[in-house]
Amino acid sequence: MDVFSFGQGNNTTASQEPFGTGGNVTSISDVTFSYQVITSLLLGTLIFCAVLGNACVVAAIALERSLQNVANYLIGSLAVTDLMVSVLVLPMAALYQVLNKWTLGQVTCDLFIALDVLCCTSSILHLCAIALDRYWAITDPIDYVNKRTPRRAAALISLTWLIGFLISIPPMLGWRTPEDRSDPDACTISKDHGYTIYSTFGAFYIPLLLMLVLYGRIFRAARFRIRKTVRKVEKKGAGTSLGTSSAPPPKKSLNGQPGSGDWRRCAENRAVGTPCTNGAVRQGDDEATLEVIEVHRVGNSKEHLPLPSESGSNSYAPACLERKNERNAEAKRKMALARERKTVKTLGIIMGTFILCWLPFFIVALVLPFCESSCHMPALLGAIINWLGYSNSLLNPVIYAYFNKDFQNAFKKIIKCKFCRR
């Protein structure tokens, strides 16, 4: 969003300078050719990467069937929104930055500001929708499976655009101050105090609060699941120890001492149906695992504990088998929890990046109209803050590509043009 101008011709009055600051502002005649070249290269690279990254996300979801689910529909819609920012907003913002002057007329300025506010607000609200979707999926996983439909995703996406329209349209209908159009060389958003509060809270501060609450509850739910899993493992381990201790003590060897070969450990065979000797075979929780249990030796003879029956009555569960089953179950739970924590971590990084990019901008956007000429903001710092917000549209696809293996594989296929060969 563009709430401040970068330069206003040869005028240097306080009301016309960037951020309403005092002192002289670099005029169009003072802008050097080297500044224009360097700025054009930097901003051109940013815009190109933003377009390419978001286009790849959209193409990946459209071409890769494994990515076509409700959660990724929200991500795809976010990419479309960021693509609109990159194509419709950033080129005009870059031209404004390079020339240090608005040269496209007042009508185009109004359209530029409306598109800027609409697309940037929708992009921010998409992050809210993604956080809300993850919150429902983690806190109500069973019921939300049936509720997580494309229709619900479409409703969330439509809501983000509706709120964006409600925030972007009012200045075009007159909710602005007369000073907003006083300088033909400047193009800034309305500095009306009421609209400033309405737009900044609607586009950023309320969504920020909502995301903080949602992610706080997501982390709390994830932590509860982890602790619950640990308690189950500990309880199962205690039960296994109790069941093992109830087994009859081992018989002594002929010399009255436990034999050196007593209570041998299990021999694990990964191939189902492999012949086993001197032991009892039982298929555990892992369908690909067979346990061979040699229990006790007396002289040259061997005695084997009976395997637990289907009903579990009058049988003893071998400790090694129970430990193996427990390890298998625990490993599966750890894998599931690791995937869940990775998802939460990824979305947390997205939210953190969003805050880093947009918080400085919205602090300035909220404070500036109220402090008038008492605020002092260097023009260069203002431009950096402005483009830091725009860069969020570049960083979103980078984060998804880095953390999501499915997206990585789809991007590789796009680069190698494997989809073209189908």
UniProtKB/Swiss-Prot annotation:
<dbReference type="GO" id="GO:0005102">
    <property type="term" value="F:signaling receptor binding"/>
</dbReference>
<feature type="glycosylation site" description="N-linked (GlcNAc...) asparagine">
    <location>
        <position position="24"/>
    </location>
</feature>
<feature type="topological domain" description="Cytoplasmic">
    <location>
        <begin position="60"/>
        <end position="73"/>
    </location>
</feature>
<feature type="topological domain" description="Extracellular">
    <location>
        <begin position="99"/>
        <end position="107"/>
    </location>
</feature>
<keyword id="KW-1133">Transmembrane helix</keyword>
<keyword id="KW-1003">Cell membrane</keyword>
<dbReference type="GO" id="GO:0019229">
    <property type="term" value="P:regulation of vasoconstriction"/>
</dbReference>
<feature type="binding site">
    <location>
        <position position="116"/>
    </location>
    <ligand>
        <name>serotonin</name>
    </ligand>
</feature>
<feature type="disulfide bond">
    <location>
        <begin position="109"/>
        <end position="187"/>
    </location>
</feature>
<dbReference type="GO" id="GO:0007268">
    <property type="term" value="P:chemical synaptic transmission"/>
</dbReference>
<dbReference type="GO" id="GO:0043278">
    <property type="term" value="P:response to morphine"/>
</dbReference>
<dbReference type="GO" id="GO:0043025">
    <property type="term" value="C:neuronal cell body"/>
</dbReference>
<feature type="binding site">
    <location>
        <position position="346"/>
    </location>
    <ligand>
        <name>1D-myo-inositol 4-phosphate</name>
    </ligand>
</feature>
<dbReference type="InterPro" id="IPR000610">
    <property type="entry name" value="5HT1A_rcpt"/>
</dbReference>
<dbReference type="GO" id="GO:0007198">
    <property type="term" value="P:adenylate cyclase-inhibiting serotonin receptor signaling pathway"/>
</dbReference>
<dbReference type="GO" id="GO:0030594">
    <property type="term" value="F:neurotransmitter receptor activity"/>
</dbReference>
<dbReference type="GO" id="GO:0014062">
    <property type="term" value="P:regulation of serotonin secretion"/>
</dbReference>
<dbReference type="GO" id="GO:0007186">
    <property type="term" value="P:G protein-coupled receptor signaling pathway"/>
</dbReference>
<dbReference type="GO" id="GO:0042053">
    <property type="term" value="P:regulation of dopamine metabolic process"/>
</dbReference>
<feature type="topological domain" description="Cytoplasmic">
    <location>
        <begin position="217"/>
        <end position="346"/>
    </location>
</feature>
<feature type="binding site">
    <location>
        <position position="403"/>
    </location>
    <ligand>
        <name>1D-myo-inositol 4-phosphate</name>
    </ligand>
</feature>
<dbReference type="GO" id="GO:0001586">
    <property type="term" value="F:Gi/o-coupled serotonin receptor activity"/>
</dbReference>
<dbReference type="GO" id="GO:0031117">
    <property type="term" value="P:positive regulation of microtubule depolymerization"/>
</dbReference>
<feature type="transmembrane region" description="Helical; Name=4">
    <location>
        <begin position="153"/>
        <end position="174"/>
    </location>
</feature>
<feature type="binding site">
    <location>
        <position position="405"/>
    </location>
    <ligand>
        <name>1D-myo-inositol 4-phosphate</name>
    </ligand>
</feature>
<dbReference type="GO" id="GO:0001662">
    <property type="term" value="P:behavioral fear response"/>
</dbReference>
<dbReference type="GO" id="GO:0051378">
    <property type="term" value="F:serotonin binding"/>
</dbReference>
<keyword id="KW-1015">Disulfide bond</keyword>
<keyword id="KW-0297">G-protein coupled receptor</keyword>
<dbReference type="GO" id="GO:0004993">
    <property type="term" value="F:G protein-coupled serotonin receptor activity"/>
</dbReference>
<feature type="short sequence motif" description="DRY motif; important for ligand-induced conformation changes">
    <location>
        <begin position="133"/>
        <end position="135"/>
    </location>
</feature>
<feature type="binding site">
    <location>
        <position position="352"/>
    </location>
    <ligand>
        <name>1D-myo-inositol 4-phosphate</name>
    </ligand>
</feature>
<feature type="region of interest" description="Disordered">
    <location>
        <begin position="235"/>
        <end position="261"/>
    </location>
</feature>
<dbReference type="GO" id="GO:0007210">
    <property type="term" value="P:serotonin receptor signaling pathway"/>
</dbReference>
<feature type="binding site">
    <location>
        <position position="404"/>
    </location>
    <ligand>
        <name>1D-myo-inositol 4-phosphate</name>
    </ligand>
</feature>
<comment type="subunit">
    <text>Heterodimer; heterodimerizes with GPER1. Interacts with YIF1B. Interacts with GPR39 and GALR1.</text>
</comment>
<feature type="topological domain" description="Cytoplasmic">
    <location>
        <begin position="404"/>
        <end position="422"/>
    </location>
</feature>
<dbReference type="GO" id="GO:0099171">
    <property type="term" value="P:presynaptic modulation of chemical synaptic transmission"/>
</dbReference>
<dbReference type="GO" id="GO:0071625">
    <property type="term" value="P:vocalization behavior"/>
</dbReference>
<feature type="topological domain" description="Cytoplasmic">
    <location>
        <begin position="133"/>
        <end position="152"/>
    </location>
</feature>
<feature type="glycosylation site" description="N-linked (GlcNAc...) asparagine">
    <location>
        <position position="11"/>
    </location>
</feature>
<dbReference type="GO" id="GO:0042428">
    <property type="term" value="P:serotonin metabolic process"/>
</dbReference>
